[in-house]
């Protein structure tokens, strides 16, 4: 007999079955549901992230660690994190940062020696300026001077922009274009891990644009985590909600 299931309180649960998942190499978009074997009955899952290992994401639309489906009702997850779980940085011009961890069951998190960081938001675009180049007696004729692009937000995969975000910091925005005495607004700085991107600089014609919203450190997804360590503003950056 490979698996034994017992019905408890109307829920089928694996009896004495614990699925242990060891992450020992850097990985992206880790799907807990798939890695646990796409279970059809409740299961207990233990995820061990080795020291220094990074779990990231290739897109802000998908968390670094998540589930393509929630685990069956009654399941539990334990995450022992000695590495880093980090969402992708948001792209320039107000791109939203990615989520680091999305819960798929009732979860216990030991983050004592690890980090869980949401992706930084992308920096805002600089505002546009303009210059009237017509003579005093002629109808107005404008030259428009564009603002600079914002920087990418921080992430294991940094957001793209004038400067790409790094793991620990957002990328700098570009300076605005210059025409004669007129300068477009500068692009805003990409957000640090779990931090919104900065406003772009205002132009004389259009205002500055806001920075992007940071990704969550943990998307609760209706579940409530139990933290056994490492739940502080340094090791968990971004909202837990």
PLM feature spans:
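Extracellular disulfide-bonded cysteine-rich modules/repeats
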Residues: 2-7
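Glycine-rich, low-complexity segments
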Residues: 8-20
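Intrinsic disorder/low-complexity segments enriched in polar/small residues
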Residues: 9-10, 36, 138-139
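Exposed regions on extracellular, virion, or secretory-pathway luminal proteins
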Residues: 11, 38-40, 72-75, 210-211, ...
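N-terminal segments that cap or nucleate solenoid repeat domains
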Residues: 17-64, 225-232
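Glycine-centric low-complexity/flexibility signal
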Residues: 45-46, 50-63, 82-222, 233-241
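Beta-solenoid repeat scaffold
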Residues: 69-82
